[in-house]
Amino acid sequence: MKYATDYGYEIKPVYGPGDVADMEYERDLGDPGSFPYTRGYHENGYRSRMWTQRMTAGLGSSSDANKVLKKYREMGQIGGMCVIHDRVSSSCIDADHPLAKRENGVLGWPGSSLLEFEELMQDIPLTGQSITVLGCSAPSTLRLAYVVALAEKRGIDPTEVHGSVFESPFGNPFGQTDAQPFDLNMKLFLDAAEYVARNKIRMRGGLVGQHFQESGGNNAQALAIELSMLKEICGRLVDERGLEFEDAVRVPYQLVSIGSRFFEEVAKVRALRRMWARMAKEHFGAKTEKACQLLIAVHTSGRTMTYQQPLNNVARCAIQTLAGAMVGCTALDNATLDNAYAEPSALAARMSLNTQHIVASETGVADVVDPHGWFLFRRKPDQRG
């Protein structure tokens, strides 16, 4: 039997000091909070800021989705909310068009007007939590306009709202419904990105590597795609829109997929942080530490949730959630045990959200920054010796 990573790299039965003989600590790892940020961006990790623990909502009418969001808050959703657009809105089709008759509110929230967004956010605060609305690239500017308009209607300065409501077009070929031309989607994304950058609005644009990996890509390919997207978007904002890199880099965030190959998933995100830090400094000439840091959100892998024996998906979700926590993510969404055949039931959603709570409060993973960074594993046996 051959033991290998999902991208074909042979795995040895045991590893020792010789396997890291060429590694220099300051160059390749660094302390948490120090360049190249392999071990994380904050020296105190989750002690200073716990990751956002949330579930993705979106089914039925805006009123239905609003009830689900409130239910998630009652279940203990922490730090933010997340909604996904339905295919009608993502395809830029109006909700009352005949083409939309059988698709409104299917696989997402029917957000084709400001009124729909107001109903979605009824009695839900715009501040004090991150506001995330996922969907295709074409209606990105609409989703951003909804947030700004509703904030102004509530008497809130739009710069006080933070989250993500627009996405790059790179995810469209990998499972998203978007019939608009790539060039148009890119223009709309850059329009939204330039607007938030110049107006100091803390809404980010998603670069969703998750779509690629959920469509069959392996970890190495996903890492390459994610870095390529970052380089392209930041390059266009600097070269075509005239932004300073330090302003451009505040826009993108990376949504990565975390599967069940535990150590590979952790290594992938650690590598992403380090490689982006070096690209920011060496290619773009980053002038600040903040510009070398990438906001990374995690979604556990939906494609690993099987239709057969769905209760086994609880174990898969727990493993993936622990991996997501180990990498020092900013936010985490879980897939659910019924992910393969239905929108989350109340029980499935509660179990997935509780999985995050258990990982955060009962495993000790939040007690130490970068526990996967070997030193903890080495020190623990010494303490018991």
Show the residue positions of the predicted features:
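Catalytic alpha/beta active-site cores
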Residues: 1-265, 283-286, 290-297, 325, ...
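A generic alpha-helix surface/boundary motif
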Residues: 144-145, 274, 316
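A non-catalytic, amphipathic alpha-helix used as a structural packing/dimerization or gating element
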Residues: 188-191, 229, 271, 275, ...
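Short glycine/threonine-rich loop-to-helix capping motif typified by GTGT followed
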Residues: 217-223, 259-271, 300-314, 342-352, ...
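Hydrophobic alpha-helix feature that most strongly marks membrane-spanning transmembrane helices
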Residues: 271, 277-285, 319-326, 330-334, ...
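Hydrophobic alpha-helical bundle architecture
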Residues: 282-283, 303, 314-318, 322, ...
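Active-site or pore-adjacent capping/gating segments
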Residues: 330-385
